[in-house]
Amino acid sequence: MNKKQWSNPPAMQIDPKKTYHATIESNKGTIEIQFYPQYAPKTVNNFVFLAQEGFYDGISFHRVISNFMIQGGDPTGTGRGGPDYRFEDEVKGNPLTHDTGVISMANAGPNTNGSQFFITHSPQPHLNGKHTVFGKITSGQDVVNAIRQGDTITKVTIRET
């Protein structure tokens, strides 16, 4: 799938003092997420930017590991694709941990975040400090648990409150 690419991460477009929510519509149902920009402003800004650009629409969950997580955000579906830029982790001073139903950035090592994210099925404390947690599922954990490899994201919508 050909998606737009950028040479740099997006400029800050969100207000970290506001609350942001995403609705991820998939072929298995809807997942509602609340983001925490006060702990991971660059990461939330990045997800909001990509969602508003339609980057995630039509992309599959290319990696699903039972009782662990679902991973999406790669337009190539190989686990190697992204928006053509990388940005740093936001784990220092971030009190959010890898509990059940959190959304976190997938990466290929420190400071290699792009567009790929994962949502946990269960607590994954071994990932704390290695991946930026930036939100929590508020509705649809049953959908997360039902998603299988190859299921697709239909649309991601962002709301600000």
Map each language-model feature to its residues.
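Cyclophilin-like peptidyl-prolyl cis-trans isomerases
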Residues: 1-161
